[in-house]
């Protein structure tokens, strides 16, 4: 088994490779240091670390724009407000920035995010920029809610009657279960 710099596995028996999709800050720092030590030779750096050209270019641009800390900040998952997304989209649509340049300027990790925002904005307008709820929807309550507090004496008595019926039903069920339990016990 051979581990690659991408924190993956290369099994010689099956010739299958598994790679994690994200790179940690330490690995990015090593790549940038190698790049700078080798006279900014990007092809050598890509071959040495087995990186895609666009990935290396993005890291170099982030490093040039924000320094070494720029690589760490952009790796975290963030939630962006619809207003922020709209500002980025307007900057790209007005020709002020390309998608890549907007990522560097606004501190966004990947230009693919900006492309998704642009598509959503073109299809649905500002509503496409509002985050959708994630996960399973909440379940309905299984039990009915208690009725509101009674306002009159008659409503108060009806509520008390309802409580007593529920209590009576619980006691009957408990008594029935006890009888079934006693019948199942063998006599010793």
UniProtKB/Swiss-Prot annotation:
Domain of life: Bacteria
Chain spans, region Disordered: 133-153
Family: Belongs to the IS150/IS1296 orfA family.
UniProt-recorded name of the protein: Uncharacterized protein HI_1720
Taxonomic source organism: Haemophilus influenzae (strain ATCC 51907 / DSM 11121 / KW20 / Rd)
